[in-house]
Amino acid sequence: MEQEICVVSFSGGQDSTTLAVWAKKRFKKVYLVGFDYAQKHSVELECAQKIASLLQLPYEIISLDFLENITRSALFKNSNDLMGHSHVQNKDLPNSFVPNRNAIFITLLHSYAQKIGASNIALGVSQADFSGYPDCKEDFIKSIEHALNLGSNTAIKILTPLMFLNKAQEFQMAKDLGVLDLVIKETHTCYQGERKILHAYGYGCNECPACQLRKKGYEEFQTKVLFQ
């Protein structure tokens, strides 16, 4: 029975919403878990709650607001750093990177999975079309899966069906799953928390790295649709 339970890391964004629908079609029980880490775009939590209700899936938020007190990122509410620059702690990374964020998320998801008897965790990470975050790469995910299972004497699988999909392919996946309209109108990606203007690709400021990546992906998706 436990093989039929999946815990989905759920932010209310394009990736995690597509992932949630994917999981719902494959597992008997799906639990959505989100994180409040004092992010500027906390409106995503409101979007996540609405989407969870529309999908009729249980949703729980874990508070991690202490993160902004122990590390630095342009994503935090207390940050005055402008997006699009290098991280002050590591010039090779964008300043929107939150050090060890995914490691913390995955560790907590792993504990949650043990609590409810789930043998699967699903993440919406991708290394094909991403923002330069090393903790979204396959080698990191495989390594932390191995470490957490060693430390807990478990065999919980971390599933990453979007790992090698770019944004255009993710839009196609959403279309194939029958939720393209939901992804465009209800999900949130914008780092600035902007939800006043609905663009063709969804709501956003149209300027931050997240919006630019999503816009580019949608335009590529539309181009492929036209030539199909």
From Swiss-Prot:
Its cofactor is Zn(2+). One of its GO terms (biological process) is queuosine biosynthetic process. Binds 1 zinc ion per subunit. It catalyses: 7-carboxy-7-deazaguanine + NH4(+) + ATP = 7-cyano-7-deazaguanine + ADP + phosphate + H2O + H(+). The keyword Heme does not apply. Transmembrane segments: none annotated. Its EC number is 6.3.4.20. It holds the Pfam family QueC. It is an enzyme of class 6 (ligase). Pathway: Purine metabolism; 7-cyano-7-deazaguanine biosynthesis. GO terms for molecular function: ATP binding; ligase activity, forming carbon-nitrogen bonds; zinc ion binding. Zn(2+) binds at C190, C205, C208, C211. ATP binds at F10, S11, G12, G13, Q14, D15, S16, T17, T18, L19, A20. Keywords: ATP-binding, Ligase, Metal-binding, Nucleotide-binding, Queuosine biosynthesis, Zinc. Belongs to the QueC family. NCBIfam families: 7-cyano-7-deazaguanine synthase QueC. HAMAP family: QueC. Catalyzes the ATP-dependent conversion of 7-carboxy-7-deazaguanine (CDG) to 7-cyano-7-deazaguanine (preQ(0)). This is 7-cyano-7-deazaguanine synthase. The lineage of its organism: Bacteria, Pseudomonadati, Campylobacterota, Epsilonproteobacteria, Campylobacterales.
